[in-house]
């Protein structure tokens, strides 16, 4: 692979990390006590010219774990009126995360990345729920970095002057339907588009690849 082509890889662009966009819908704000009700993951890929774009999508409705707290206001907000309805087709936290992690590890390996890193809007919230659900399910092979994330709320505030997902998308020229919002599937797909737009915009502005002199300085600091 040529030096230029090497720079146009996820591995080089994100220091060995494999970015995965996540969104969750929950029954509250406390990741330890409140139910995880829906989760979606969108993986990303980089084309041969170095442009970032969405790859695959995996989505699950999730059944509340035993003893989970369900806050009425949260359910009204996300529109999940009956978390126990069989019509939701919900699976356990363990099943959802195992399938998501399986897909992530497969694509991460193909991209030759060392670890997955979560991309999310207000990422601390989604990250905390995924980590707690992994602990409850006793999943030892969690592909995500334990604390590092890419937060599109912060990134879009820098790039577009907007931190609310809907407003950031509209400012970036990404269609956003407020009626579809607060579905993990819809929000994850829009967040993925937003993150790709930010990364690609930085490339268009000349921010990536780094100049050779910058790369040399980084290499020296690591030796």
Swiss-Prot record:
Coiled coil: none
EC top class named in words: hydrolase
Site positions per UniProt: Important for substrate binding and specificity: 29, 77, 125, 147
UniProt key word Transit peptide: no
Binding site for Mg(2+) 1: 23
Source species, domain of life: Bacteria
Keyword Magnesium: yes
EC numbers: 3.1.13.-
UniProt GO molecular function: 3'-5' exonuclease activity; magnesium ion binding; nucleic acid binding; RNA exonuclease activity, producing 5'-phosphomonoesters
Gene3D superfamilies named among the record's database cross-references: Ribonuclease H-like superfamily/Ribonuclease H
InterPro entries cross-referenced by the UniProt entry: Exonuclease_RNaseT/DNA_pol3, RNase_T, RNaseH-like_sf, RNaseH_sf
Cofactor note: Binds two Mg(2+) per subunit. The active form of the enzyme binds two Mg(2+) ions in its active site. The first Mg(2+) forms only one salt bridge with the protein.
Cofactor(s) listed: Mg(2+)
Gene Ontology CC terms, in alphabetical order: cytosol
Residues where Mg(2+) 2 binds: 23, 25, 182, 187
Function text: Trims short 3' overhangs of a variety of RNA species, leaving a one or two nucleotide 3' overhang. Responsible for the end-turnover of tRNA: specifically removes the terminal AMP residue from uncharged tRNA (tRNA-C-C-A). Also appears to be involved in tRNA biosynthesis.
Family: Belongs to the RNase T family.
Name of the molecule in the record: Ribonuclease T
Lineage: Bacteria, Pseudomonadati, Pseudomonadota, Gammaproteobacteria, Vibrionales
Gene (name only): rnt
